[in-house]
């Protein structure tokens, strides 16, 4: 099954059975996946929209990863997603869970370790990812978390939450946004205030020319000059087409 991308980005939430994926998605989006204490309650992919400040990011609760392999349609979904949230239960041998998850991903040529992608001589799909230790409020979670963090923090961001108790969820939203490497840019017309409710979403490192093309496919070619507020030397001065934009910049395009 294919789920059309909505919002600023699409993030697939993955994990082993009963890791806490559905509880997490239910807690930070408008989705209502089935949440239960027993495994394999998620049979289909369920999308939901997560609000972060003035944008929305689509999260997809996916069926649990279970041996021997990832189903073809789920593999396709993970490849299409902009990033992955990897959820592991901190009370159930989180390091073993991570080993199982990465092994299943690598069988389908999906890697989350940049070093493996660089070393491989075959075509791999490298994905941005964030590791989430779930169920922080239970039993041995706080004791198991340091080992998870120490083993993976050089590769990927790692954090601990309790979706049920609401612990760490606001921080998680910000981590998701930062992981995506996107920026928000706002447009304005001369002598008018910018609309801060409808940003252009661009990849980090994008230029004024990229922003013009995002507004309309013809604008990049027709662009004569632009004024910028934010990352320019002085607010409102003209900037070159190759000026690299930063999160929160306001631009005024002149065609």
Please annotate each region the language model reported.
Residues 1-9, 14, 19, 113-255:
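C-terminal-of-GTPase-core extension/linker across diverse P-loop GTPases
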Residues 1-95:
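Conserved G1/Walker A P-loop phosphate-binding module
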Residues 29, 33-36, 44, 48-52, ...:
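Signal for well-folded cores of large energy- and translation-related assemblies
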Residues 50-57, 72-160:
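Conserved C-terminal guanine-recognition region of P-loop GTPase G domains, centered on the G4
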């Amino acid at each position: 099954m294919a789920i059309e991308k909505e919002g600023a980005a699409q993030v697939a939430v993955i994990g082993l059975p009963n890791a806490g994926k559905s509880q997490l998605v239910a807690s930070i989006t408008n989705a209502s996946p089935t949440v239960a204490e027993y495994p394999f309650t998620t049979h289909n992919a369920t999308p939901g929209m997560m609000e972060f400040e003035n944008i929305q990011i689509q999260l997809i609760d996916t069926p649990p990863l279970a041996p021997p392999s990832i189903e073809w349609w789920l593999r396709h979904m993970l490849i299409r997603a902009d990033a992955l949230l990897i959820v592991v239960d901190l009370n159930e041998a989180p390091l073993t869970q991570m080993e199982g998850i990465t092994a299943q991903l690598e069988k389908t040529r999906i890697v989350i370790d940049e070093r493996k992608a660089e070393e491989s001589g075959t075509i791999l799909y490298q994905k941005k990812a964030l590791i989430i230790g779930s169920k922080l409020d239970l039993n041995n979670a706080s004791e198991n978390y340091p080992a998870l963090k120490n083993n993976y923090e050089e590769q990927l961001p790692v954090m601990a939450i309790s979706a049920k108790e609401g612990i760490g969820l606001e921080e998680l939203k910000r981590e998701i946004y930062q992981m995506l490497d996107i920026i928000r840019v706002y447009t304005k017309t001369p002598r008018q205030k910018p609309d801060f409710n409808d940003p252009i979403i661009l990849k980090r490192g994008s230029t004024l020319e990229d922003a013009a093309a995002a507004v309309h496919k013809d604008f990049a070619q027709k662009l004569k000059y632009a004024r910028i507020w934010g990352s320019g030397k002085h607010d409102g001065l003209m900037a070159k087409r190759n000026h690299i934009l930063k999160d929160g910049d306001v631009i005024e395009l002149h065609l």
